[in-house]
Swiss-Prot record:
It comes from Pyrococcus furiosus (strain ATCC 43587 / DSM 3638 / JCM 8422 / Vc1). Pathway: Cofactor biosynthesis; coenzyme A biosynthesis. GTP binds at residues 48-50, 67, 69, 124. Transmembrane segments: none annotated. This is GTP-dependent dephospho-CoA kinase. Pfam families: DUF359. It catalyses: 3'-dephospho-CoA + GTP = GDP + CoA + H(+). It is an enzyme of class 2 (transferase). The keyword Transport does not apply. Its EC number is 2.7.1.237. HAMAP family: Dephospho_CoA_kinase_GTP_dep (MF_00590). InterPro entries: deph_CoA_kin_Thcocales (IPR054930), GTP-dep_dephospho-CoA_kin (IPR007164). NCBIfam families: deph_CoA_kin_Thcocales (NF041125), PRK01160.1-1 (NF002246).
Length: 177
């Protein structure tokens, strides 16, 4: 049985607001600022452009989640050393149970010293939410804010509670109903 969490219309506006600190600027400025704040041991990136540009400034995310698209257009990021590569299907506007399990598995691999890349077949736009839920406290999750910059989330108990609340307010869909 497939289970997914679907973003309802009433949450879409809320999620357009950054979940963390917005670092504004043209590329590479936000990534150079990011490098001053975080180190690779605590970095999780969500999105092709974010992952690619983090790597370009010398950061090596422990977990990178991307879908070979940017703003719903095909995109082939320049991403070199991957570590373990996992793939998962995740339709737009959803968080599938499979994505949740894959992110959880990625963190168990990271605890063993491996960097992990998850390539999403579909869309990873909501993946920052489960990335925060499963991330160790003190980690940093970064995702893109189109035409503005990047959003930096420091993973705290409060931040995890907020993401859990978002998940609770999503519509649960079983077997595509």
């Amino acid at each position: 049985m497939s289970v997914m969490f679907k973003l309802p219309l009433n949450l879409r506006q809320e999620l357009k607001k950054p979940l963390g600190e917005l670092i504004k600027g043209e590329i590479p400025i936000p990534y150079l600022k990011l490098k001053e704040i975080v180190n690779s041991n605590t970095l999780i990136t969500v999105g092709d452009v974010v992952t690619e540009n983090s790597l370009k400034v010398g950061l090596r995310p422990r977990l990178a989640i991307y879908d070979h698209k940017t703003e719903r257009r095909e995109y082939k990021p320049e991403i070199g050393d991957k570590g373990v590569l996992l793939t998962v299907k995740n339709p737009p506007g959803t968080i599938t149970l499979h994505l949740l399990k894959t992110i959880k598995k990625a963190y168990s691999l990271i605890r063993r010293g491996t960097n992990v890349h998850i390539v999403v077949n579909g869309e990873e736009d909501l993946a920052a939410i489960p990335a925060v839920l499963y991330a160790p406290l003190g980690s940093f999750v970064v995702y893109g804010q189109p035409r503005e910059g990047i959003v930096l989330i420091k993973v705290t108990s409060e931040c995890k509670r907020r993401c859990a609340e978002i998940m609770r307010n999503m519509e649960v869909v079983r077997n595509g109903d």
